Amino acid sequence: MDTSKVHGNVKPFRCPGYKQASSPSFSPDACRCPHWHHLALKSGCAGLILLLLSLIGLSVLVRFLVQKPPIEKCSVAAQENRTELTGRSAILECPRYWHPHWNKCLFVSQISRPWAEGRDACSMEDAILLLIENKEELRFVQNLIKGKEQLFFIGLKYVQKEKIWKWIDGSILNPNLLRITGKDKENSCAIISHTEVFSDSCSSDNHWICQKTLIHV
């Protein structure tokens, strides 16, 4: 028997459905990322750029805000200076030789005249004879003239028809405020010392005390 023919007619045995495995083949685009990867990469890059721009803008804003307070402080200081100047212009002061007390300026005369002349002298200074409003003011005035031997007219006069003491503004004397020593009679005016208030003739010569409202300077 010719064995060569036998071997030549022999076909290799294959199981049904079996296919010879072939070595994997790779296309040129096999290593490239899918299309959506490219889109994601581009979107990420754009997001990073926007984030970077936002950070730059934020840093500029922070620097501006940090530098702004000194400017505002200068503005506030300028405003305070203007307010201070305005406040100075609104300061209330008394004229020379006048004594401040609360909202009043008081003037103690250096000469003696009758009550009416003292009243007129006060009027020439845009003032009136003193109106004592309370006990505290009474003490202040008596301390002001303490050590002086003179007596001083004030804006208090006896009204014979009404049998009462009245201040020159028309108000009636409160007896709890002042106790007047002397007679209550016509043409009587009140004079004050550093200890008491007396009744004296309005025609007698005495010093006087004027008052006026504090003025703006």
Curated annotation (Swiss-Prot):
It comes from Mus musculus (Mouse). One of its GO terms (cellular component) is plasma membrane. SUPFAM superfamilies: C-type lectin-like. It is found in: Membrane. Glycans are attached at residue 81. Residues 67-217 are extracellular. SMART domains: CLECT. Highly expressed in dendritic cells. Detectable in natural killer cells. This is Killer cell lectin-like receptor subfamily B member 1F. The gene is Klrb1f.
